Amino acid sequence: MAITKIIADSITSGAIANTPAFLATLGSTQSVGDNSWTKANINTEIFDTDNCFDASTNYRFTPNKAGKYFAFGQIFGDPGSASDLVYVYSGIYKNGSFVRYSSIDFRNNLGREATVLHTGIFDMNGSSDYLELYGNVNANDGSGMKFNNNHTYFGAYKILT
């Protein structure tokens, strides 16, 4: 009975929670260069439990608690007006360095637009480690590349371990 009360009190007081956590979106369409990794300027917070996401200058998540974090980011790649999309990549960078990515490739049958979601688990030190969302859009004509704001987003939360 005493253990049940301790667990219940911890849950209701917030002592056990998947925080810090955040979810943010791209506030408006972002123009990007053709075939180049570009940071997504994620600037519209949906929520940010511990004020760890910078939505105004660096567009990065710097959690203030050490541990493992589940992070996810989606890039909506749009080549402009033509149906000549070659590929879209979505990747998460840690401390300014590329870690991993997901992609969709249309080289054999060009597309119009695509969303690519990437997820991963990251060890964070709780002080200086940070995560950022990057994307890469490539099209045959090489002009008009953009991240569409309707479906480009970034989020993360601490995993209870």
Short names for language-model regions:
Residues I3-I6, G14-T161:
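Extracellular jelly-roll beta-sandwich "head" domains, especially the C-terminal globular C1q domain
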